[in-house]
């Protein structure tokens, strides 16, 4: 189950999922992070979670700076030791962890790789993927718990497979899609 008002802002050209060499240029271009915050109309009623393993590239730092300018709380998920090891690329001399309101350390290794292969000079095997997903899920579950404790009923989608086990799941999810359709661009 996922909160209905949780929106992943996955800018394809910046994620490295496609055209990985292009992502290097995008994540190190001034203005991209600010543009993403402005384009998605993020407001102070929202909270922005920015994930950058090194925390040193320009776009995530710019996104955090722009969010803070707009009064939006920022949570950073980053590898603190790795970030400290590297020099920031940002002209203001700041890193993501310096700008964020809350920093969650994914404890990823320097270089984001752990496995040594015999006769190969480079380590492989990311150490950030699983902790990043885990930390996001911790944030989401804590958010739901806090809202319930304060007397709110959070909007949470049922897992799609639950429609086969509980009659009103599909209707429940459809109502949430209708509620957030114009607010969340990737619905």
Labelled PLM ranges:
Residues 1-140:
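Glycine-rich phosphate-binding loops that contact phosphosugars or nucleotide phosphates
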Residues 22, 154, 177-178:
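Generic intrinsically disordered, low-complexity segments enriched for polar/acidic and small residues
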Residues 163-187:
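Acidic, Ser/Thr-rich low-complexity intrinsically disordered segments
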């Amino acid at each position: 189950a996922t909160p209905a008002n949780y929106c992943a802002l996955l800018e394809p050209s910046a994620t490295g999922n496609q055209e990985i060499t292009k992502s290097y240029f995008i994540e190190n271009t001034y203005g991209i992070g600010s543009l993403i915050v402005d384009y998605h109309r993020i407001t102070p009623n929202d909270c922005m979670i920015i994930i950058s393993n090194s925390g040193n590239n320009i776009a995530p730092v710019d996104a955090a700076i722009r969010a803070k300018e707009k009064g939006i709380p920022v949570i950073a998920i980053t590898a603190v030791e790795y970030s400290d090891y590297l020099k920031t690329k940002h002209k203001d001399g700041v890193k993501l962890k310096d700008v964020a309101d809350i920093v969650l350390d994914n404890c990823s290794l320097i270089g984001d790789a752990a496995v040594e292969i015999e006769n190969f000079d480079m380590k492989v095997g990311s150490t950030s993927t699983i902790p990043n997903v885990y930390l996001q899920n911790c944030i989401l579950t804590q958010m739901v718990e806090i809202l319930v404790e304060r007397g709110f009923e959070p909007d949470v989608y049922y897992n799609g497979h639950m429609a086969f086990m509980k009659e009103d799941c599909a209707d429940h999810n459809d109502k949430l899609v209708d509620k957030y359709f114009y607010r969340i661009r990737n619905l």
